[in-house]
């Protein structure tokens, strides 16, 4: 298992700019203007006292440390210590009275435990370490006595408690920690037995098919292997393939609005599911070393993640759609299976506030996992612009990655080691990469990585170069998408942003944290006229996934086609066009990265069969 560098890794280049945008948007301001964080019961207030503040801190803490921003750091520390200061004498930490514990969903205990452990990874804070120990020991004692047990959310997210237990056990192993882990597993849901419920979508809300539960669930075996020492069985790989077959999307996620929704290109995927799927892939790669999890992570991170935010990250969606031609509130019944008709709007709290609280972990945790420490050296797991300092066998080592990946196919990696230390540097190479070269020479790639074992002396730089070709990918609908490297491309639709300012249930929406409907002002009904795909590079903008100035585009020949609306809706296209016969002239049009396109057509018909 690898080691995350936490306080010793810092972002640079486009990744730092993305994190700065995030800090200037909702993530860095929720505690100032959103009642469920600002006035939370976790701090003695009268608002929500369950998952929302812990969710926010789970992303806000690493964001503050990655940017090394004094104001953000002070606010994160203030929240953590306000929570710890309210811990009860027996160790119970959640904001509820003693006589309410039996009916308090223990998901919040597991979540705050994970957050306190994360804080302690960055800060040598004995008060919080002690509070975390007492929190988990209290949970053990209450569960062992039968005074509390897992139900509802806690039952379906039991494995999240292993994160805090692992943190404690690595520092001070005690038998009760393993015992608590076993109780969580025994009382938790058995996901392998639930697959018959995943075969087809149902317009019914239930925990067993809840998309966020399932995206979290896919790491449970990795966590069990890391904590209990279990032998891997591949069960979560099998569960992934089951979900992918019946509910997979073109951008590596699964549909769920809010429960499993099939392979339709107009069903939604919840933002919480996006960030939790990223976190799952990070854990699975860290524990297994299997590159497929890193591939999956990048597909989600560089496509689904940026697509569901406004460029300034003040607004987000609850649900995103692969073919998304309008984000307008449905006047009658919702198109989504259990979510309401405003779930695809961009704003402060569309549909429900869980994503407002939980969206913050995506970019920061990706940055933390870019460079990882292994038993015999270092691993560049993701070609992201970062620098890190650590020790290998007691000797100081610095490493820096300079790159504009995923918009470019090259990276410069510099290692500084002035004591002549021999160690292994592993460079993960994406599975799609062709003609992989190191310093101009053809590189040997084995099991998805280049492995360099040598004595590093002074400052040494490596130039890693890759190539890729844009290509079509066939979807279950029979339509095609375009991919280039890890990026999926879409036809952007010209958009009018219609601002909505209002107050609902005591929560004010006003600029910049207002809501937006997105109105299409150009046609969207096109198909691919031939196989021509030409990649064009552009400067990487100050907004890396800019909707106005994308860093890479693909020119394609498209033709208009008769494409009706979904029955009962006039802002949702049917899954497929009515015909494969063009109804107009072929046009040279520009596709942009899916993550840059807020209104878009991604799955389109190939109007002429092409041999691939």
Which residues make up each language-model segment?
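Low-complexity, Ser/Thr/Pro/Gly-enriched N-terminal "stalk/linker" regions
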Residues: 1-52, 70-93, 126, 182
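Extended, well-ordered alpha-helical scaffold segments
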Residues: 10-18, 68-85, 104, 123-142, ...
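Well-ordered alpha-helical scaffold segments within catalytic/enzyme domains
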Residues: 13-15, 57-70, 111-125, 160-173, ...
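Solvent-exposed loop and edge beta-strand segments that line ligand/cofactor-binding
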Residues: 37-53, 94-112, 144-158, 190-219, ...
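Catalytic-core region of carbohydrate-active enzymes that cleave or remodel glycosidic bonds
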Residues: 223-246, 265-314, 324-325
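C-terminal beta-rich recognition modules with glycine/proline-rich loops and embedded aromatic residues
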Residues: 236, 295-303, 308-411, 465-612
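Beta-strand-rich binding/interaction modules
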Residues: 420-440
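Solvent-exposed beta-strand/loop surfaces of large extracellular or lumenal domains
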Residues: 433-454, 470-477
């Amino acid at each position: 298992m690898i080691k995350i560098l936490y306080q010793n890794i810092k972002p640079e280049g486009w990744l730092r700019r993305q994190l700065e945008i995030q800090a200037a948007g909702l993530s860095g301001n929720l505690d100032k203007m959103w009642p469920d964080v600002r006035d939370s019961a976790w701090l003695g207030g009268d608002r929500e006292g369950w998952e929302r503040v812990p969710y926010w801190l789970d992303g806000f803490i690493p964001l503050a440390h990655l940017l090394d921003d004094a104001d953000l750091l002070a606010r994160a520390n203030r929240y953590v210590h306000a929570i710890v200061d309210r811990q009860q004498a027996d160790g119970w930490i959640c904001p509820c009275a003693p006589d309410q514990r039996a009916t308090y969903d223990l998901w919040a205990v597991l979540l705050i435990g994970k957050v306190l452990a994360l804080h302690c990874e960055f800060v040598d804070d004995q008060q919080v370490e002690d509070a975390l120990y007492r929190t988990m020991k209290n949970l053990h004692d209450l569960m062992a006595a039968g005074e509390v047990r897992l139900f509802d959310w806690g039952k379906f997210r039991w494995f999240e408690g292993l994160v805090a237990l692992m943190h404690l056990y690595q520092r001070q192993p005690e038998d009760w920690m393993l015992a608590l882990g076993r109780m969580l597993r025994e009382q938790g849901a058995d996901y392998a037995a639930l697959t018959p419920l995943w075969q087809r979508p149902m317009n019914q809300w239930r925990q067993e098919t809840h998309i966020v539960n399932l995206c979290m669930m896919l790491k449970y075996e990795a966590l069990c292997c890391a904590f209990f020492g279990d032998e891997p069985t591949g069960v979560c790989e099998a569960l992934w393939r089951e979900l992918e077959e019946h509910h997979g999307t073109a951008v590596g996620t699964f549909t769920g609005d809010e429960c499993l929704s099939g392979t339709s290109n107009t069903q939604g995927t919840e933002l919480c599911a996006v960030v939790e799927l990223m976190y799952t892939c990070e854990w699975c790669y860290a524990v297994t070393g299997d590159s497929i999890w890193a591939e999956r992570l990048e597909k989600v991170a560089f496509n689904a993640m940026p697509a569901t935010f406004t460029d300034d990250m003040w607004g987000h969606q609850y649900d995103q759609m692969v073919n998304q031609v309008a984000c307008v509130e449905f006047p009658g019944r919702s198109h989504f299976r259990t979510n309401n008709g405003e779930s695809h709007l961009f704003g402060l709290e569309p549909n429900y506030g869980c994503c407002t609280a939980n969206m913050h972990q995506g970019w920061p945790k990706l940055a933390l996992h870019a460079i990882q420490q292994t038993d015999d050296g270092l691993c560049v797991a993701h070609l992201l612009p970062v620098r890190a300092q650590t020790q290998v066998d007691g000797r100081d080592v610095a490493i820096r990655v300079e790159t504009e990946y995923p918009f470019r196919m090259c990276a410069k990696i510099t290692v500084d080691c002035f004591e002549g230390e021999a160690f292994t540097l592993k460079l993960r190479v994406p599975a799609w990469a062709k003609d992989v070269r190191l310093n101009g020479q053809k590189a040997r790639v084995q099991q998805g990585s280049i492995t360099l074992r040598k004595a590093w002396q002074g400052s040494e730089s490596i130039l890693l170069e890759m190539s890729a070709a844009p290509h079509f990918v066939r979807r279950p609908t029979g339509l095609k998408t375009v991919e280039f490297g890890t990026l999926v491309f879409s036809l952007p639709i010209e958009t009018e942003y219609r601002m909505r300012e209002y107050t609902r249930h005591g929560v004010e929406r006003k600029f910049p944290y207002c809501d937006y409907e997105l109105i299409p002002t150009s046609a969207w009904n096109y198909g691919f006229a031939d196989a021509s795909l030409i990649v064009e590079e552009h400067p990487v903008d100050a907004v890396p996934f800019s909707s106005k100035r994308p860093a890479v585009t693909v020119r394609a020949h498209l033709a208009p086609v008769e494409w009706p609306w979904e029955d009962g809706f006039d802002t949702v296209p049917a899954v497929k066009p009515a015909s494969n016969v063009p109804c107009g002239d072929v046009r040279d049009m520009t596709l942009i990265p899916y993550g840059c396109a807020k209104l878009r057509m991604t799955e389109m018909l190939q109007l002429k069969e092409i041999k691939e």
